[in-house]
């Protein structure tokens, strides 16, 4: 799912268990997934892809004002919105989602909290993101059924870290420079170390016995 969104910009928008098969072989340790039923497919623009990557990095670094700017660019907030007013609400919703560590993040719980937040603050869901949210939440739900200890950011952030450190495209390099250097051009060693440690940490903690073969 991450590759579909962040690499190809073309994704399966209805990834329920009947539309995915776990197959042996391939380049992956635990085999690979085969998708069927392509009646509900969608695309994501390059601009949205890169902004989502930035939003994930800002989420990990708990930079809520920058994340509010990402939401604004993606269309979840109007251009007239005072973003400073949203820092604390975002911190309450997203900061509490982590618990003691990044891996405690649960997208379904955060989505539910955001739904309540929309009654008090001018968040809106652009129509082009409806299928993206559906697809990601569906896949997280399936993963949680297979492994109740599954944590989506333990999969997503290492993927993003690897992309930032190995992708030579101008857009990704710009994001990396924004992460590693502050506004005065000084290198932020802690953030660079975080990216590197995440990249080299072994995150393959999925039990192969839990992968169904249909």
Language-model segment annotations:
Residues 1-214:
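Conserved catalytic cores of large enzyme domains
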């Amino acid at each position: 799912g991450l590759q579909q969104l962040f690499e190809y910009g073309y994704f399966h928008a209805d990834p329920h268990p009947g539309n995915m098969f776990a197959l042996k072989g391939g380049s992956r340790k635990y085999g690979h997934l085969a998708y069927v039923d392509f009646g509900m497919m969608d695309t994501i623009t390059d601009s949205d892809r890169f902004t989502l990557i930035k939003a994930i990095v800002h989420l990990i670094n708990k930079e809520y004002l920058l994340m509010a700017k990402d939401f604004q660019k993606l269309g979840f907030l109007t251009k007239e919105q005072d973003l400073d007013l949203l820092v604390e609400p975002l911190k309450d919703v997203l900061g509490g989602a982590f618990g003691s560590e990044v891996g405690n993040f649960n997208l379904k719980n955060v989505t539910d909290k955001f739904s309540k937040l929309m009654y008090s603050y001018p968040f809106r869901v652009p129509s082009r993101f409806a299928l993206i949210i559906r697809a990601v939440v569906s896949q997280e739900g399936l993963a949680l059924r297979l492994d109740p200890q599954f944590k989506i950011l333990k999969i997503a952030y290492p993927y993003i870290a690897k992309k930032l450190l190995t992708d030579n495209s101008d857009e990704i390099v710009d994001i990396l420079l924004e992460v590693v250097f502050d506004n005065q051009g000084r290198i932020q060693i802690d953030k660079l170390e975080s990216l590197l440690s995440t990249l080299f940490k072994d995150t393959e903690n999925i039990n192969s016995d839990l992968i169904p073969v249909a």
